[in-house]
A protein has these predicted regions:
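Juxtamembrane, membrane-proximal amphipathic segments and lipid-exposed surfaces
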Residues: 1-2, 83
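A general marker of short, structured functional hotspots
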Residues: 2-8, 13, 74, 165, ...
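A transmembrane-helix-recognition feature enriched in membrane-embedded lipid enzymes
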Residues: 3-65, 117-118
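Soluble catalytic domains of membrane acyltransferases
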Residues: 59-174
Length: 174
């Protein structure tokens, strides 16, 4: 049954979801950049990030139920360290965690049209893993952004992994 559902989903994924993901990333990324420049990075993060993530969960479709959100103090800053199993980790965290935060992400993501400029203008932190001095400077910048209820999210593996095995953790998050 699972294989049948997988096969049934493939045309939808390639004809509807993937094109939607590409277009929505470009549109929401540019919108976020403009909002961050002219209105507020916080509003840009909500519209360009949280709304984009929830919309992509809906179109995928992924149904998310969050438990325990009432235990999170929105005025408190947190360092959140999460495993990175798929692209959907980003949708779930951005769309449903319910707090203001900045991502710490690999610099290569800066090159994605829409996404890169949107994330930069919102204030997310890019890590250049090929240059340790720049990486350390980026981590210091991340530490400075953990104020007034703004948190930081790391994926300590540095990238997604295929399968269920965890990758080796990088030092930056710790």
């Amino acid at each position: 049954m699972r294989k049948f559902l997988y096969l049934l989903y493939q045309p939808y994924k390639w004809l509807v979801y993937i094109p939607f993901l590409l277009v929505s990333t470009l549109v929401f990324g540019i919108t976020a950049a403009l909002l961050a420049i002219f209105v507020s990075p916080r509003l840009a993060s909500f519209i360009g990030g949280a709304l984009w993530a929830k919309l992509n969960c809906y179109v995928t479709p992924i149904f998310v139920k969050v438990k325990g959100r009432e235990n999170v103090d929105k005025k408190q800053s947190y360092v959140i360290v999460s495993n990175h199993q798929s692209q959907f980790d980003i949708f779930v965290l951005y769309g449903y965690i319910g707090i203001e935060f900045k991502w710490v992400m690999k610099y290569e993501l800066r090159k994605i049209p829409g996404l890169g400029i949107g994330c930069e203008k919102i204030g997310h932190v890019f890590i250049d893993r090929s240059d340790s001095e720049k990486a350390i400077a980026s981590l210091k910048a991340a530490r400075e952004r953990i104020v007034n209820g703004t948190s930081i999210i790391f994926f300590p593996e540095g990238t997604r992994r295929i399968g269920n095995r965890l990758g080796e953790f990088k030092k930056g998050a710790f």
